[in-house]
Amino acid sequence: MVNRRKVVVVGGNFAGLACAMKLSRRYEVTVIDSSPHFEFLPNIHELVSGVKTPDLLRLPRARLIRRMGHRFVQDRVTGLDAADGKARTASGQTWRFDACVVAIGGINNTFGLPGVEQYTLPFKSVDDCAAIGRRLVTLVESGRKVSVVVVGGGLEGVE
């Protein structure tokens, strides 16, 4: 049996899964992510409008990765040692690798604007959008006039 090179992919959403898929069966791939679910973010705005529910946008990450012939580890990476080829996780495990891909996604950039953290709701995950939807329902049911401001013109803001 041929010893395949080991690749650790940190992060299991779009970029991480695309990488794992591309690596196919030529490599022994371990995808490490703290969440058991892959979140289908292109339809995330449909949570706010109530067209979709959170469970429709979450898929079991382990099943998706197993279908590719790879291993999924639900854990949080706490350290990478590129020289030694090791990834350490919160549970205390160490995963050896010949190559490592870091695909942990992005964060909302508030550009240091005052009040952003206090007065806005993030739009980056299924939970974020479900919270926005609940907040809008509460505001509409209050009978008061509701104004919504979208800050940002990226894909999520446009949707």
Regions found by a protein language model. Give the residues of each.
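FAD-binding core/adjacent interface of flavoenzyme oxidoreductases
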Residues: 1-4, 69-147
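Beta1-alpha1 glycine-rich phosphate/pyrophosphate-binding loop at the start
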Residues: 2-71, 148-149, 155-159
